[in-house]
UniProtKB/Swiss-Prot annotation:
GO BP field: iron-sulfur cluster assembly
PROSITE patterns found in the cross-reference section: FRATAXIN_1, FRATAXIN_2
InterPro entries cross-referenced by the UniProt entry: CyaY (IPR047584), Frataxin/CyaY (IPR002908), Frataxin/CyaY_sf (IPR036524), Frataxin_CS (IPR020895)
Gene that encodes it: cyaY
Matching SUPFAM superfamilies: Frataxin/Nqo15-like
Keyword line: Iron, Metal-binding
Organism: Pseudomonas syringae pv. syringae (strain B728a)
Pfam families: Frataxin_Cyay
GO molecular function, one term: ferric iron binding
Protein name: Iron-sulfur cluster assembly protein CyaY
Protein family per UniProt: Belongs to the frataxin family.
Record's function text: Involved in iron-sulfur (Fe-S) cluster assembly. May act as a regulator of Fe-S biogenesis.
Cellular component GO terms, alphabetical: cytosol
Length: 110
């Protein structure tokens, strides 16, 4: 069963807040901007992670230095999974943070 619009927005809002919390708690020098449902994480070296919601598809999209990725929410496992690789959003974020900032962060709770 697909997500309702309200459930989708609640999930994306919570996920974006959890991502912000991980970066805030890390002490890493990043700029966080959340505007109109788009979360942008700007790293010291100029690279970015951009999270946006695609309401018609009920997907969370991520733009990173290595490309663009689309995530569907898996209600059974309560996680976002990439629609092309099934890799979890949390795993990708851990990898991208190392690639773009040289720091390991734990996103397992998002």
């Amino acid at each position: 069963m697909s997500l309702t619009e309200a459930r989708f927005h609640d999930l994306v809002d919570a996920t974006q807040q959890n991502i912000e919390d991980v970066f805030d708690d890390s002490g890493l020098d990043v700029d966080l901007e959340n505007s109109a449902g788009v979360l942008t994480v700007k790293f010291e070296g100029g690279t970015q992670l951009i999270f946006s919601r695609q309401e018609p598809l009920r997907q969370l999209w991520l733009a990173a230095r290595s490309g663009g990725f689309h995530f569907d929410y898996d209600e059974e496992n309560q996680c976002w999974a990439c629609d092309s690789s099934d890799e979890l959003l949390s795993e990708m974020l851990e990898r991208f943070t190392v690639e773009q900032a040289g720091v390991e962060l734990d996103f397992s709770e998002i």
